A protein has these predicted regions:
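Extracellular and organelle-lumenal recognition/adhesion modules and their flexible linkers in secreted
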Residues: 424-597
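Structured catalytic-domain cores with a bias toward divalent-metal coordination
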Residues: 1-425, 510
């Protein structure tokens, strides 16, 4: 650190002398230079690998190399990753048995941060390992996020062991079985929500009471994973009500422990997440995942973070939502990353747990200092209301057992583009309700173009009134997601009025949670630090609390008041899940006015 005292020079000198040189970031390059990690890891049951950004190529490659060491030499049999548990099972099926393909399975986890060349290569290495070794390694997500796939997975399991209970869950849990309706769960009447939680509690009790019978009908592992689906569903449903992340890290730690229990005694796991989760940090009196895991497994964990001085990474831009490459210059003086950079080593690791307990290095390792910490979104204004910055305050030895340092980084390489739906200009009133046009009807907008997006096009089928129809359809290897056809309307002429949007629908959908819906969504003014690209709707109203399956033409309608704060609103046609839906005979009305379009 330029201009700092002799003690700081002593720190830099200690870093140079204690550094573990790393020969390469490239996987499949041998393990010789990683030998010092044997002592760092020791008899740990969990090795938790962090990353200073969610979009750095070198961090992913280094973590891949450490997984190779842990699996090949140290007996680890599980990789847990910061991704949704239910969706991750498709990746596990691929790495274990070659079911499906790696690219689809990875994209199906829905976390774009992992949908990169580096993680895809990791998955292919895991598949190679399992094809050539008797001791297998498994892939699990440990995040609770979206309720729908958890609900569907739970119903699938129950259909094998308790068909009557599965049928009851199809009905009772219906609002949570679709990606579109699950976020509206908090709007349901309290009695309806309580009925859902009561049903989940009954299911969890049945897992305990019927354990021996259900294990005999399936397997011990299936029983554990089925129960985890129920727990994750309960966690996700509660999040849809309070929208609070205060328990996020605790829940991730609980899910990790549940997965290790499912895999059996002696299971050892490598975890992948952001430094902010992997470390033993405390944020507003809430521990990070690493802190909770220490409590739960008795410090049988080693936390290895990553750090960098300068370079590129990928993240979604705050203002546009577009996933793109960003770069930063050298770390600011005094930052943990800057001190590591002063040692002048381009690629190294540092054992913090076994560093000196006195002297300049010990004092530095116990001190508070900033460390770069960049998540999935970059470019927050300095005064943003969330208080997001590009650094966290750390105490190095308290937070990490070791760190891997890369002087200059490059951005992770994505497997597919992530481009948000453009922010369309609001029209003064709905148009083309007749659905004219051969492809996507003029004046309407869709999110088509992504992997396994729903296909949207004009249909030859006539509506009940003999009019034109549009078909929204998809047959994908995953069960989540929905296809939308929307129009954005200025709220100026409609504030204070009640809107009604109606359509005739017909569906071909045979999966739980699949079907058709209509919706109205009211949006605030875009601009200022309060929103960036990620605008939180003021309100959303749907035609029903669950998607509608109707092989014959039927009519749906949704009504809602326009909030005074609304700047614009969307009218939308939705096909939830896999299958097909036809829409026609659209009507829009501002009730109480002369407007009827």
């Amino acid at each position: 650190m330029t201009g700092t005292g002799a003690a700081d020079e002593a720190v830099v000198e200690w870093i140079r002398s204690a550094a573990i040189p790393l020969a390469t970031v490239e996987p499949r390059s041998g393990l010789k230079d990683l030998e010092p990690f044997r002592a760092i890891i020791g008899d740990a049951r969990i090795v938790s690998l962090g990353e200073a950004t969610h979009g750095t190529r070198e961090f992913r490659k280094l973590k891949h190399r450490l997984l190779e060491l842990c699996v090949a030499e140290l007996g680890f049999t599980m990789l847990g990753i910061e991704a949704p548990f239910p969706e991750s099972l498709a990746v596990n099926a691929y790495v274990l048995d070659g079911i499906g393909n790696a690219a689809d399975a990875l994209a199906g986890t829905r976390y774009w941060v992992w949908d990169t060349e580096e993680v895809l290569d990791l998955i292919e290495w895991m598949r190679w390992w399992n094809e050539n070794n008797a001791r297998k390694v498994k892939f699990y997500g440990f995040v609770t996020d979206f309720p729908a796939v958890a609900a569907l997975g739970l119903i699938d399991f129950l259909s094998r062991v308790a068909p009557d209970l599965a049928a009851a869950c199809k009905t009772e849990l219906a609002p949570l079985t679709s990606d579109f309706t699950a976020p509206l769960f908090g709007q349901l009447a309290e009695s309806r929500r309580e009925a859902v939680f009561a049903r989940i509690a009954q299911v969890l009790a049945a897992f305990a009471q019927q354990r021996s019978e259900w294990v005999a009908a399936t397997s011990a592992l299936d029983w554990h994973l089925g129960r985890l689906h129920a727990n994750v569903l309960d966690q996700a449903a509660r999040f849809e009500i309070d929208r609070s992340y205060t328990s996020h890290d605790r829940v991730m730690a609980e899910n990790v422990c549940a997965l290790m229990e499912a895999e059996g005694p002696g299971t050892k796991a490598v975890l992948w997440s952001h430094n902010a989760h992997a470390s033993r940090a405390t944020y507003d009196d809430e521990k990070s995942m690493g802190g909770y895991l220490d409590e739960m497994i008795g410090r049988a964990q080693r936390v290895i973070g990553t750090s960098f001085d300068r370079g590129a990474f990928q993240a979604r831009a705050y203002t546009t939502g577009v996933l793109t490459d960003h770069s930063v210059p050298a770390a600011p003086p005094g930052a943990f990353d800057a001190v590591l950079a002063q040692a002048g080593l381009p690629l190294m690791a540092l054992d913090l747990a076994n560093a000196p307990r006195d002297g300049a290095a010990a004092t530095w390792l116990a001190s508070e200092m900033p460390m770069r910490s960049i998540g999935g979104i970059y470019g927050f204004p300095s005064d943003n209301k969330l208080g997001v910055t590009d650094t966290n305050t750390i105490k190095p030895r308290e937070y990490f057992d070791a760190v891997m340092f890369v002087a200059e980084t490059t951005a992770a390489r994505r497997n597919q583009p992530l481009v948000p739906t453009p922010n369309s200009v609001a029209s003064p009133a709905p148009s083309n309700l007749e659905l004219c046009g051969d492809g996507i009807p003029a004046g309407w907008q869709s999110g088509a173009g992504r992997r396994y997006a729903h296909a949207i096009a004009a249909s030859d089928a006539a509506s009940p009134n003999g009019g034109r129809t549009v078909r929204i359809s998809r047959d994908a290897p995953w069960r989540w997601g929905d296809g939308k056809l929307t129009q954005k309307i200025s709220a100026q002429a409609f504030r204070g009025k009640r809107l009604r949007f109606a359509a005739a629908i017909r569906t071909e959908a045979n999966d739980v949670g699949a079907g058709a819906l209509l919706y109205l969504q009211f949006l605030p003014h875009r601009g200022g630090d309060e929103s960036g690209f990620f605008v939180t709707p003021l309100a959303t109203a749907a035609s029903s609390t669950e998607p509608v399956w109707s092989p014959e033409w039927s009519r749906l309608a949704v009504e809602a008041e326009v909030p005074e704060a609304a700047d614009s609103f969307l009218i939308g046609l939705v096909m939830a899940g896999n299958g097909a839906a036809w829409f026609g005979d659209l009507e829009f009305a501002a009730i109480g006015s002369r407007a009827f379009l």
